[in-house]
Amino acid sequence: MHPMIPAEYISNIIYEGPGADSLFFASGQLRELAYSVETTAESLEDELDELDENWKGSSSDLLADAVERYLQWLSKHSSQLKHAAWVINGLANAYNDTRRKVVPPEEIAANREERRRLIASNVAGVNTPAIADLDAQYDQYRARNVAVMNAYVSWTRSALSDLPRWREPPQIYRGG
């Protein structure tokens, strides 16, 4: 973030934004989907074991091969879903942490309002030191917000690059 971005701009974006609830929800949905994929894989494995006991021959071998490849994909897919849920949950927590660290908009507004009030009543420069103090405080707000947002951007970029690369399910039938 540019160091001259007004402090209230960053605070307002963070405080007035949609929040992290949708990310927490998505993370939970991905965990549920991962569980569903695991359950499906276990069910298929049980069916394959039962079929293997009762059905022998080349067609049974072809089916077993196809199902085994699909089961491997399901297992990897379930792990990827869990990992994606973990990353997204981390993103939501990072957002909430950033929100806690950013200067609240009300605090910045109070600073600016007090500055305006002091300027309006600055007869013979009596309020000049107090105005300077408020300006210094505002500069600290800006620096803090920029630093917090830079850390957030850095962390989220790293986390997003850690999301899994999804693969298509294997082809069930290998023509030959």
From Swiss-Prot:
Pfam families: PPE (PF00823). It comes from the Bacteria. The keyword Nucleotide-binding does not apply. InterPro entries: PPE_dom, PPE_sf. The keyword Secreted applies. Its main location: secreted. GO terms for cellular component: cell surface; extracellular region. Induction: Expressed during infection. Expressed during exponential growth in vitro. Immunodominant antigen that could be used for serological diagnosis to distinguish patients with active tuberculosis from M.bovis BCG-vaccinated individuals. Candidate for development of a vaccine for the control of tuberculosis. It is found in: Secreted, Cell wall; Cell surface. Keywords: Cell wall, Secreted, Virulence. Plays a key role in regulating innate and adaptive immune responses through human Toll-like receptor 2 (TLR2). Interacts with TLR2, leading to the subsequent activation of the mitogen-activated protein kinase (MAPK) and nuclear factor kappa B (NF-kappa-B) signaling pathways. Induces macrophage activation by augmenting the expression of several cell surface molecules (CD40, CD80, CD86 and MHC class II) and pro-inflammatory cytokines (TNF-alpha, IL-6 and IL-12p40) within macrophages. Also participates in adaptive immunity by directing Th1-polarised immune responses. PANTHER family: GLUTAMINE-RICH PROTEIN 2. Interacts with human TLR2. Belongs to the mycobacterial PPE family. This is PPE family protein PPE57.
